Amino acid sequence: LVHPLACLPEPALESPTQGSIPDDAACMALWDKYGMLDNIRAHSRMVAHIATELAQRARAAGFPVNVAAVRASAMLHDIAKTYSVLHGGSHAQLGASWVVAETRNHALAQGVLLHVHWPWAVPEQEPERLFSIPFFVIYADKRVKHDQCVPLRQRYEDLLVRYGHTEKARKGIRLSWQQGECIERAFEAHLGYAIHEDSFDSGRLVQRA
């Protein structure tokens, strides 16, 4: 399986310098504007929670991470999911275009565009690229089953049961799983502790919801 973007040059991964960074209230206003279903909102909150926790830890470890930008991109990563469920199309591509239109912030949109799969090699030995918006959002999304934080294995075993009806589908799911494990190992190596079974204090978020 070859991702259609894989033949293109890798993008620059920089902290946002132009456009706005919407806070939670502004992100939720966009959820309303684009008619996001309640279950996708709950999923997005958990993805944003995990991405934010990871971004804060990376920043505390000395990496130059814009935590607010990571959170906003994670909150908006599935902004077009409801539309795509109803009408088809790539929710990542459409969502990225909406985020550019609404915020003029291409770094946030990059996280939305690439949250399903990073089509190039994961920069395991380049922490300045690894600790960027797309990888926080990709990994956080892979750790959430519906609206619960779970280990990668639990998430992907569920996906294989629900969607692995063909060999092509199973191959795609396994490739995504492998990429999640690669990002996880790289995060662990640079942060200096294990995150593969970390709940990121997600119970606190569930209690507040």
Predicted regions and their residues:
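Divalent metal-dependent phosphate-bond-processing catalytic cores, especially two-metal-ion Mg2+/Mn2+ enzymes
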Residues: 1-18, 33-63, 76, 120-209
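A short small-residue
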Residues: 25-34
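A structural motif
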Residues: 107-108, 148
